[in-house]
């Protein structure tokens, strides 16, 4: 059917075939047009008009608004291909050539308003060889390049969920073979699936791509020897970025093995249950631990805080180094204030370095880099005479080559830089000998025009004669139509207007040629100088990134000190013991949401040789869930190197945190609440260790009472008596039968949420005390929830019958015919 299409539509079809599953935006003059199904998608998602020509649906967007519209499409998960008109087509005849020069996908963003300021934006490739899975992920905006390998899908899925990529890349066979894996990932992540050619995932192709990218002949120096699935994924990802998306890869860091440094492991379910990054309900981010802890001043510090929150340290040295730094800045309030102000002037050094390395930087970006580097020198000056803790020692000794770069940027650039190179006025006059000369000629042209205008007014006697400039005409002389006959013959008519005539002269034309030539020369010179400056900056990229890491580390510990000062956090003792002792501990999020002084603190004492499991009973709304979550959050904060909301704490390092909390169950996954509960509990039983912390909130609710009780007790016994699984466990339950375990096992201790009664009405004290709860007060909670009073009254009657000698309540007479 192609022969029936116009030449332009044939060209569109060729581009569309190249674009694949991308939405194609096709440049036509001052618009980008979409056709057929793409036009429908464009119109529906951008709220623009859908039209048609010769029965072909079409819609379009102005070229000047391209970036904003593309961002909106990508934010909704679409991949977009841009087909541009070829350059230098003036005077050419026939159809203008068009080629795809950009493909934009959610995970492959170099520079975009969609990039989260304080989070990574990963595209992740995945590959399988036999029973092994290899993954590789890139954050193109900062050059981070990671690889990893797993021998089971559970660890694979957990790793991908922690990285939280926005785009997943593989080949058709992998997607077909691993539908269950992809389905699980889509349940946890908002992710765009991309497909690439299978041969790119083969070892020979992948290694060749890696060799070329990093200019090496072996990958052993990267520590990748033997990691065939990971190497395959890494090579395919580089090929996809460079060959398919047409993006640069020269700025990427060498691949690092993800997860090589051991961390406190927090699985995706626990991240969600503990509301680490976002709340289960409510506004995005608000009410999360991240939102409470976020006091960073730089994008790099913010990304470091976020990544450390979901990957706290397991190495005691790493924890102690950061604690020492937090303590140092906590005691230095004036210095902390100065540093916070200076850190707030440092922009995203990592992403600025990437933009410059990939030739995407504007003069304004260079100015931002200059100002940020200058702020770093001010930070270094303020730290110079301080007895810094070990964590920050020598991190702000700025290398001489970087000092030279900072000096160049500070002295050789104009203070207010333009957005585009073509606007000029980037460099100081003394930066290049031709700059001042050309600028003087350009500047003197203004006075020449005024002098010329005055001279020909005197020569012609026409006092209202004007010398003007228009983009289309250039310089011209304008007089009223009735005065035009008075002009000498050497005046050449250019244009007639309603009441005016426009002329030029040989002298004016010669002047214009000289001025235009100067402007062209000036723009060419500044463009050349700008490119040279960018190359000079790229030579210092490693030093800039090293300084960026130092800024992130400083921002991290200063922000934690600021948090500790604001809420009177205390330094926990963290060591290799198996202690978990917290005095007057408080939930860090709830503490910020309540009026000052109203949150009730509670103690916790657990030790493997003594209490290894706390069975917590008490009515709903009495604070049980808040308390057990609180313990997990305080452990996480402590292993981040942070101070915590407690009077004191002694925390033995934890290797894993597991939670089973029903509030976040997602029934859209196709599993019942009970099945979700059992699956999460099974994960805990299989993977907990003696150094783990387990939080269980109501096990066995979704089945019969005796089934549920049996499951709950079996879980308790497993965690108490199975070698290698004796994790510290906080178990909130309504099964009062479980509390009898305290009499038979020395490692179990009963606690309950205290409730006082006043005229039969419960008063929740929010205190956790020894012993088990006597009443559940469930009917009272139902009343508070708005149950009809008749239902509340009937429930009370049934409860009394249950508590009496006859444990089977009789139905009300009015209901007997209905029930039987």
Swiss-Prot record:
Q: Which key words are in the record?
A: ATP-binding, DNA damage, DNA repair, DNA-binding, Nucleotide-binding
What InterPro entries is this protein classified in? DNA_mismatch_repair_MutS, DNA_mismatch_repair_MutS-lik_N, DNA_mismatch_repair_MutS/MSH, DNA_mismatch_repair_MutS_C, DNA_mismatch_repair_MutS_clamp, DNA_mismatch_repair_MutS_core, DNA_mismatch_repair_MutS_N, DNA_mismatch_repair_MutS_sf
Annotated residues that bind ATP are located at 618-625
SUPFAM superfamilies cross-referenced by the UniProt entry: DNA repair protein MutS, domain I, DNA repair protein MutS, domain II, DNA repair protein MutS, domain III, P-loop containing nucleoside triphosphate hydrolases
Which Pfam families does this UniProt record tie to the protein?
MutS_I, MutS_II, MutS_III, MutS_IV, MutS_V
Please report what switches on or represses expression of this protein: In infected human monocytes transcripts are present by day 1 post-infection and last for the 7 days of the experiment. In patients with confirmed synovial Chlamydia infections, 5/8 had transcripts. In infected human Hep-2 cells, transcripts are visible from 11-48 hours post-infection.
GO CC terms = cytosol
Report the domain of life of the source organism.
Answer: Bacteria
**GO MF annotations, alphabetized:** ATP binding; ATP-dependent DNA damage sensor activity; damaged DNA binding; mismatched DNA binding
Q: Which SMART domains match?
A: MUTSac (SM00534), MUTSd (SM00533)
Q: Which BP terms from GO are recorded? A: mismatch repair
Q: What does this protein do?
A: This protein is involved in the repair of mismatches in DNA. It is possible that it carries out the mismatch recognition step. This protein has a weak ATPase activity.
Cited HAMAP family: MutS (MF_00096)
> Which family does the similarity line name?
Belongs to the DNA mismatch repair MutS family.
Q: What is the protein's given name?
A: DNA mismatch repair protein MutS
The organism is Chlamydia trachomatis serovar D (strain ATCC VR-885 / DSM 19411 / UW-3/Cx)
